[in-house]
């Protein structure tokens, strides 16, 4: 958790650089940046699942493709606070809510909740 919030601090400490990266006329730069973060996040998630012997993949609750989609959606949302020049205190509030939302979903994937068929 501390590492995550340190990354938010880093983004806001280097806000102008991130704003340039995320909104530059070269869309491929942002897409490549996002893709690299998502790939790293997805790889770490898959390693965690293997190391913890979680059955999310073997049960079919998670596929590498779904992991990629969820990670991409999260980081895209996280970077929207920069794209829209959101003040840090407001961004932190929104990101906390996003994390609670995604945490509930990941719990369902990791531990199953019986709602997979609904």
Task: Give the positions of each predicted feature.
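Short, hydrophobic secondary-structure boundary micro-motifs
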Residues: 19-22
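Generic alpha-helical secondary-structure signal
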Residues: 2-3, 94
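Helix-rich interaction surfaces within compact, conserved domain-sized segments
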Residues: 56-61
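C-terminal peripheral helix-coil segments that are non-catalytic and often amphipathic
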Residues: 13, 43-50, 67-118
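Amphipathic alpha-helical packing segments from all-alpha helical-bundle domains
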Residues: 3-13, 28-54, 65-72
């Amino acid at each position: 958790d501390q590492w995550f919030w340190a990354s938010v601090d880093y983004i806001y400490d280097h806000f102008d650089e991130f704003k340039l990266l995320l909104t530059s006329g070269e869309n491929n730069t942002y897409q490549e940046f996002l893709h690299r973060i998502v790939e790293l996040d997805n790889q770490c998630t898959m390693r965690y699942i293997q190391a913890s012997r979680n059955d999310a993949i073997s049960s079919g609750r998670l596929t590498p493709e779904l992991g990629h989609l969820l990670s991409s959606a999260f980081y895209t949302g996280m970077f929207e606070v920069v794209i829209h020049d959101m003040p840090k205190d407001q961004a932190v509030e929104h990101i906390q809510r996003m994390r609670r939302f995604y945490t509930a979903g990941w719990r369902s994937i990791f531990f199953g909740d019986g709602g997979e068929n609904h």
